[in-house]
Amino acid sequence: MTARNRIRSLLCKACSTAVLVALVSGQASLVQAGPREQAKRIHDRVAGVPPSEVVLDDMASDIESGRAIDAAFTAMQDSAFYDVTLKNFAAPWTNEAMSKFVPLNDYIATVIGLVRDGEDFRKVLYDDVLYIGNASLNLPNYSTSNNNHYESLENSGASLKDNLEREIQRSL
């Protein structure tokens, strides 16, 4: 083995060790965190916003009782999960540039509605369903020729969690 190869091998081992240490120490901080810190981190990641004290206490209690999944479902009840997290999750699928910075549209609204209603996610591919804004919001009518309905819904600031209604797509 030449000197250059030995140096390269030692550098690779050193880099690998450094990456491993960084990963392990990052995980260790989560393990060392108490239930409230874990609950806050889960809520921040899932909903993208800090939880209220009541929600934080509820989630911490779930975590302390070994029910971290229940804590995550609690975080999913925050409107920001639907308005931001799910919108950004589905948005890249709706445009060629795969950008999450696009206006709300029928596909994104339908993904959000199906998740909110606990439906089989595969239905987004085959079911005759479409989610539109609640009629009480006085939005422009749904149209297949423009996106005015969904852009107005998003601009209204209305919660997507509370204001999407399931419709039969072929009836619109």
Label every PLM stretch briefly.
Residues V21-L30:
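C-terminal segment of classical bacterial N-terminal signal peptides
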